[in-house]
A protein has these predicted regions:
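Nucleic-acid endo/exonuclease domains
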Residues: 1-113, 117-163
Length: 163
């Protein structure tokens, strides 16, 4: 891999957004269409959730699989250069995600993580999107007391039960 000049690398990194990303905007539009009203980047809570639905006391994080290390995901690749730096960076991201989740649970706030991979699949597959949004609605409104951190686990269960 060709080594980049510090200025080039800095410019590349500056283009990586942390707020109002395309996946976040996609999820916000879906939630709005479903009738939910929410706060964006709600800084009054630990971890500043991407979306906070006050009525249901629910924090939603829209996580990139690469940066937040989505388990068993092909998007969560590991860079070949500067391995020590990346390993430390990723470990800290995951630790911080766990800490934030625990703090929110202590405050009796429901936490939902929506992964980049799931959003990609929703955009490609209308049937998947419908099922996903149904489970998301149930999670937000706490119809069931889910223990899984991940809606994709419930999607797998739902798909198996339909076969």
């Amino acid at each position: 891999m060709k080594k980049k000049k510090p200025l080039t690398r800095s410019q590349n990194m500056a283009r990586i957004k942390s707020k109002n990303t395309k996946p976040e905007i996609y999820i916000r539009k879906l939630l709005y269409k479903m009738g939910y009203r929410y706060r964006v980047n709600y800084s009054q809570l630990p971890g500043t959730p991407d979306i906070f639905i006050l009525k249901y006391n629910t924090a939603i994080f829209v996580n990139g699989c690469f940066w937040h290390r989505h388990e068993n995901c092909k998007i969560a690749t590991f860079p070949k250069t500067h391995a020590e730096y990346w390993e430390k960076k990723f470990r800290r991201n995951v630790e911080r995600d766990i800490e934030v989740r625990e703090k929110l649970f202590e405050m009796d706030i429901s936490v939902i993580t929506i992964w980049e991979r799931e959003i990609n699949k929703m955009q490609r597959n209308e049937k998947y999107k419908e099922k996903y949004l149904k489970i998301l609605k149930d999670r937000i409104e706490r119809v069931f007391n889910y223990e899984e951190k991940d809606i994709s686990v419930q999607m797998e269960i739902a798909e198996e039960s339909m076969q």
